[in-house]
């Protein structure tokens, strides 16, 4: 359930070939950062293609609460920022709902300010650990008051003068890296982040685009050193947000597993730190054609033509996990229809997502007749290319645990399974992909809400 709203069960059934051309909503990572950095920059920022899911809107509301002016003009969002270093103390707690990215990055953005700011979220977000972001802020001199286990609610109070730090990110996390860099914007001197494993680099690209003095060096081992000069001026920009690769994954995998499908997905973000899923599916034999590749706002963008394919199981390299961590649930669905076993390792990060995503996937697969093994940090799926025996003839419902990606992944599973697949709640899909149901049914997918 979302913000107290009633749950909405949904069912997906075996579908005929999916066809058509679709445009995916804007990338969630870039949308969050557009509101944050646009809200902080001097002058006007204009954004088209913004993802208008609840998570991103909550980030926008938080920026408004700290002095940014945000309005919508037609299809564009227009922001008048406060200027770097000029955020105002919020009058009330900042409520991020289900948005892990929003809350963690905003903690970095405002944590170093010399005022109190309190962060709250929904039941799911309140279970997620915040310590990985709070620890570097503590090193910068921020006073932290948090619930047990460094969970929400969290209250921060910045020092009079924050100290720049040199911080080595202890896990592959774009959120931690970004929080430290955003904290560095209001910190005198040079803030340095060392990243042993490269993660999505939208924060670095966008800060450079807004005029921050930021440099990136990569050594022979692939270790990145990012340096940011604090307290510089940021100037408003015009941003066109490309389609979200994590949302693209759902119609893309659906087309691969439903016989007779041939779809085109236009304007997809193809940043190399985000394309692990596409690479993995191609290794499995997926027919994914990248067309009209181009650069837009410093990011790689392309259209994808996707056709039904006979997939083979693979072992996914562990070092690919950071570039596709959000896509493992839908990759597991693709693996259900592949010949042989698909082995996914290095998945410990999935246990601290919107749900314990690894268990949620494994439990849902078993409920729907899939042969799989779950370990502490791995998942093995043995496929049935014909979909025979998959699904749940007894109307057993997948527990989504308030997790939008679990919900969408299992609805895709039902499109090629012998029996229907039903999930206990589709309401939270609105956090990241409000148009999901309409877009999928428009391609020919048999997905519908269940009348209770």
From Swiss-Prot:
<comment type="similarity">
    <text>Belongs to the EPSP synthase family.</text>
</comment>
<feature type="binding site">
    <location>
        <position position="173"/>
    </location>
    <ligand>
        <name>3-phosphoshikimate</name>
    </ligand>
</feature>
<feature type="binding site">
    <location>
        <position position="100"/>
    </location>
    <ligand>
        <name>phosphoenolpyruvate</name>
    </ligand>
</feature>
<feature type="binding site">
    <location>
        <position position="33"/>
    </location>
    <ligand>
        <name>3-phosphoshikimate</name>
    </ligand>
</feature>
<feature type="binding site">
    <location>
        <position position="326"/>
    </location>
    <ligand>
        <name>3-phosphoshikimate</name>
    </ligand>
</feature>
<feature type="binding site">
    <location>
        <position position="175"/>
    </location>
    <ligand>
        <name>3-phosphoshikimate</name>
    </ligand>
</feature>
<dbReference type="InterPro" id="IPR036968">
    <property type="entry name" value="Enolpyruvate_Tfrase_sf"/>
</dbReference>
<keyword id="KW-0808">Transferase</keyword>
<comment type="subunit">
    <text>Monomer.</text>
</comment>
<feature type="binding site">
    <location>
        <position position="28"/>
    </location>
    <ligand>
        <name>3-phosphoshikimate</name>
    </ligand>
</feature>
<keyword id="KW-0963">Cytoplasm</keyword>
<feature type="binding site">
    <location>
        <position position="353"/>
    </location>
    <ligand>
        <name>3-phosphoshikimate</name>
    </ligand>
</feature>
<dbReference type="GO" id="GO:0008652">
    <property type="term" value="P:amino acid biosynthetic process"/>
</dbReference>
<feature type="binding site">
    <location>
        <position position="128"/>
    </location>
    <ligand>
        <name>phosphoenolpyruvate</name>
    </ligand>
</feature>
<dbReference type="GO" id="GO:0009073">
    <property type="term" value="P:aromatic amino acid family biosynthetic process"/>
</dbReference>
<feature type="region of interest" description="Disordered">
    <location>
        <begin position="1"/>
        <end position="23"/>
    </location>
</feature>
<dbReference type="GO" id="GO:0005737">
    <property type="term" value="C:cytoplasm"/>
</dbReference>
<feature type="binding site">
    <location>
        <position position="29"/>
    </location>
    <ligand>
        <name>3-phosphoshikimate</name>
    </ligand>
</feature>
<dbReference type="InterPro" id="IPR013792">
    <property type="entry name" value="RNA3'P_cycl/enolpyr_Trfase_a/b"/>
</dbReference>
<feature type="active site" description="Proton acceptor">
    <location>
        <position position="326"/>
    </location>
</feature>
<dbReference type="Pfam" id="PF00275">
    <property type="entry name" value="EPSP_synthase"/>
</dbReference>
<dbReference type="GO" id="GO:0003866">
    <property type="term" value="F:3-phosphoshikimate 1-carboxyvinyltransferase activity"/>
</dbReference>
<feature type="binding site">
    <location>
        <position position="405"/>
    </location>
    <ligand>
        <name>phosphoenolpyruvate</name>
    </ligand>
</feature>
<comment type="function">
    <text>Catalyzes the transfer of the enolpyruvyl moiety of phosphoenolpyruvate (PEP) to the 5-hydroxyl of shikimate-3-phosphate (S3P) to produce enolpyruvyl shikimate-3-phosphate and inorganic phosphate.</text>
</comment>
<comment type="pathway">
    <text>Metabolic intermediate biosynthesis; chorismate biosynthesis; chorismate from D-erythrose 4-phosphate and phosphoenolpyruvate: step 6/7.</text>
</comment>
<feature type="binding site">
    <location>
        <position position="28"/>
    </location>
    <ligand>
        <name>phosphoenolpyruvate</name>
    </ligand>
</feature>
<keyword id="KW-0057">Aromatic amino acid biosynthesis</keyword>
<feature type="binding site">
    <location>
        <position position="175"/>
    </location>
    <ligand>
        <name>phosphoenolpyruvate</name>
    </ligand>
</feature>
<dbReference type="InterPro" id="IPR006264">
    <property type="entry name" value="EPSP_synthase"/>
</dbReference>
<protein>
    <recommendedName>
        <fullName>3-phosphoshikimate 1-carboxyvinyltransferase</fullName>
        <ecNumber>2.5.1.19</ecNumber>
    </recommendedName>
</protein>
<keyword id="KW-0028">Amino-acid biosynthesis</keyword>
<dbReference type="GO" id="GO:0009423">
    <property type="term" value="P:chorismate biosynthetic process"/>
</dbReference>
<dbReference type="InterPro" id="IPR001986">
    <property type="entry name" value="Enolpyruvate_Tfrase_dom"/>
</dbReference>
<feature type="binding site">
    <location>
        <position position="357"/>
    </location>
    <ligand>
        <name>phosphoenolpyruvate</name>
    </ligand>
</feature>
<dbReference type="InterPro" id="IPR023193">
    <property type="entry name" value="EPSP_synthase_CS"/>
</dbReference>
């Amino acid at each position: 359930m979302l913000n107290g709203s009633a749950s909405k069960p949904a069912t997906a059934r075996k579908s005929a070939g999916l066809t058509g051309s679709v445009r995916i909503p804007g990338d969630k990572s870039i949308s969050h950062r557009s509101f944050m950095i646009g809200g902080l920059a001097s002058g006007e920022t204009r954004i088209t293609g913004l993802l208008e899911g609840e998570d991103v809107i909550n980030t926008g509301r938080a920026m408004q609460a700290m002095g940014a002016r945000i309005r919508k003009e037609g299809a564009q969002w227009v922001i008048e920022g406060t200027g770097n270093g000029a955020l105002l103390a919020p009058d009330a707690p900042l409520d991020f709902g289900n948005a892990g990215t929003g809350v963690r990055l905003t903690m970095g953005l405002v944590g170093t300010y010399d005022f109190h700011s309190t962060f709250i979220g929904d039941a799911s977000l309140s279970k997620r650990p915040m310590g990985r972001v709070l620890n570097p802020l503590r090193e910068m001199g921020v006073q932290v008051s948090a619930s047990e286990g460094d969970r929400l609610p969290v209250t921060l109070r910045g020092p009079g003068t924050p100290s720049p730090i040199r911080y080595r990110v202890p896990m592959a996390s774009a959120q931690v890296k970004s929080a430290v860099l955003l904290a560095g914007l209001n910190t005198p001197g040079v803030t340095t982040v060392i990243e042993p494993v490269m993660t999505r680099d939208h924060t670095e690209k966008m800060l450079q685009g807004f005029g921050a003095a930021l440099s990136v060096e990569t050594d022979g081992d692939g270790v990145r050193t990012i340096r940011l000069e604090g307290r510089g001026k940021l100037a408003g920009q015009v941003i066109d947000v490309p389609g979200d690769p994590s949302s693209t994954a759902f119609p893309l995998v659906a087309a691969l597993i439903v016989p007779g499908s041939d779809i085109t997905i236009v304007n997809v973000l193809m940043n190399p730190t985000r394309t692990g899923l596409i690479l993995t599916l191609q290794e499995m034999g997926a027919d994914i054609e990248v067309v009209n590749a181009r650069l837009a706002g410093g990011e790689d963008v392309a259209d994808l033509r996707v056709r039904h394919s006979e997939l083979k199981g693979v072992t996914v390299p562990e070092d690919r996990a950071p570039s596709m961590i959000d896509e493992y649930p839908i990759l597991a669905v693709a693996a259900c229809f592949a010949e042989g076993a698909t082995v996914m390792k290095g998945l410990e990060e999935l246990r601290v997502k919107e749900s314990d995503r690894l268990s949620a996937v494994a439990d849902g697969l078993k409920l729907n007749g899939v042969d799989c093994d779950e370990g502490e940090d791995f998942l093995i799926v043995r496929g049935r290319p014909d979909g025979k025996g998959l699904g749940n003839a007894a109307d057993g419902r997948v527990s989504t645990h308030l997790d939008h990606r679990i919900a969408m992944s299992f609805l895709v599973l039902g499109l090629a399974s012998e029996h229907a697949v039903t999930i206990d709640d589709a309401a939270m899909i609105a956090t990241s992909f409000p148009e999901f149901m309409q877009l999928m049914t428009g391609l020919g997918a048999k997905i519908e809400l269940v009348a209770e």
